[in-house]
Each structure stands twice: as C-alpha cells, then as structure tokens.
Amino acid sequence: MSDSWYKVDNVAKVFLATATPQDPRVFRISCTLNEEIDPDTLNEALRSTAQEWPQFQVTLHRGLFWHYFESTDQLPTAQPENKAPCAPLYTPERRNRLIYRVTYFGSRINLEMFHAITDGNGGLLYLKSIVRNYLALRHPGELDSVPSPNSASAGDLAQDSFAPSTVEQSAIPWQKRSRSTASTVCACPITSSSSLRAT
C-alpha cells in the first residue's frame, strides 16, 4: 500500500454526489480487433499499461469531510465479460478496489471507468495504450514505429485541469455598483487544457 493520496477535484465531486445504483456514472469504451483476444497476453499488456499510467492505479476513499484517491499496489486483471455494461464500480462493498475494469469478449476489449477518475478522452488514451501494448506482445516487431499514446509527463497527467480556471473570491476585482447598473462581472478566464481530467 502506498502513502500517496490525491484530492478529488471539483468535477469528480459532482460525479460522486450524483452516482446512484441506477446511474453509477460509469462509462465504457471498447475496441474490436480482427482476432480473438488471448487472455494471458491481455493481462500482461494491462499490467504493463498500469505501470505507464500510475494515476489510474488508485482506490477511492471517504475522509471525514471529503473523498480522496489513494495510490494502491493492486494490479488490474482483465476478466471475461460477464456483467451488464457499465455496472457500478464504486459502491460500499467495492471501496478498496480499483475504480475501472477491463473485460473481453470474443475479439473485443472493453474498458469501463468511474467518471470521477477521468473523462472519455482520458479513458480513450488509456484503452489505446492497452491495445497498443497487447498488439505489440501478440505481433513482436510490427508496432515498433507506433508511438505510445501516453506522451504526457506524470505531472501533466495528474493535474487538475480546472485549477487554472478557478478564481478565489478575494481575487475577483469587484466594484461597487449602483442598483440601476445592470452589468455582470466575470473574472473567470476561459482556458483550454490538454490534461486527462475534464468533465
């Protein structure tokens, strides 16, 4: 067990607050190959990918006042698909488990993630890494020229991309206005970000 823990960003808090058994806030991305999935090779590729993306190797915990992510030494294991798509990933009985799952069926690899950990773009990049590592193991030498989808630094991958857009109350340049002045002050800059965490 690692000592590292991470704050849950504001967008993740929304998903935590609104997740229900009927709407568990889980999304699924899949990739269908031209060949049957080999489970042993997929698990080897998944372990390799998990080491490349340590920010997804976390469990979600409830603190006294807030939730937080804690790094874990657990390794993901790909399982045959045997549940309904997007089954809950964060429930009281799953508290100390990873909050994503990888399954396979026939020639398809499925990635399901709890939305508090990343958005669809982050999930897609993670699945691309799994598939690339899987195909590199299945067909040695054929993917040497294909770059890894994970080209960002560990710091870039772990950052809260909404933080630059957040303005503290004391930083807003409020001006005293009369009631007759009908105008709105907006001090939040609009920024773009290439990090994984978004909505």
Predicted regions and their residues:
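N-terminal low-complexity, Ser/Thr- and acidic-residue-enriched intrinsically disordered segments
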Residues: M1-F15, A19-Q22, F27-T32
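Soluble acyl-CoA-dependent acyltransferase catalytic core bearing the H(X)4D motif
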Residues: P24, I29-T199
